[in-house]
Amino acid sequence: MSGGSTGERPFSDIITSIRYWIIHSITIPALFVAGWLFVSTGLAYDIFGTPRPNEYFTQERQQVPLVNDRFSAKQELEDLTKGL
């Protein structure tokens, strides 16, 4: 028995159709614009809770926040974040 058809359109038919390109000429650029707005407005930083590029180092804390001893990590993290 040979392989049967799944009833789906072949991919070559899809990407050569005018309908495909009309839809995707709008949706693909819209996704890029939406992503750019998501990051440039700062909404991505607010949603994911990451610091903005100018918030990594404050005037009071200029050192890199590294944890050096894994057994006292909790105390080191509390010391690093007490000014936040």
Curated annotation (Swiss-Prot):
Its main location: plastid. InterPro entries: PSII_cyt_b559_asu (IPR006217), PSII_cyt_b559_asu_sf (IPR037025), PSII_cyt_b559_CS (IPR006216), PSII_cyt_b559_N (IPR013081), PSII_cytb559_asu_lum (IPR013082). This is Cytochrome b559 subunit alpha. The chain crosses the membrane at residues 22-36. Its cofactor is heme b. SUPFAM superfamilies: Cytochrome b559 subunits. NCBIfam families: cyt_b559_alpha (TIGR01332). This b-type cytochrome is tightly associated with the reaction center of photosystem II (PSII). PSII is a light-driven water:plastoquinone oxidoreductase that uses light energy to abstract electrons from H(2)O, generating O(2) and a proton gradient subsequently used for ATP formation. It consists of a core antenna complex that captures photons, and an electron transfer chain that converts photonic excitation into a charge separation. Keywords: Chloroplast, Electron transport, Heme, Iron, Membrane, Metal-binding, Photosynthesis, Photosystem II, Plastid, Thylakoid, Transmembrane, Transmembrane helix, Transport. It holds the Pfam family Cytochrom_B559.
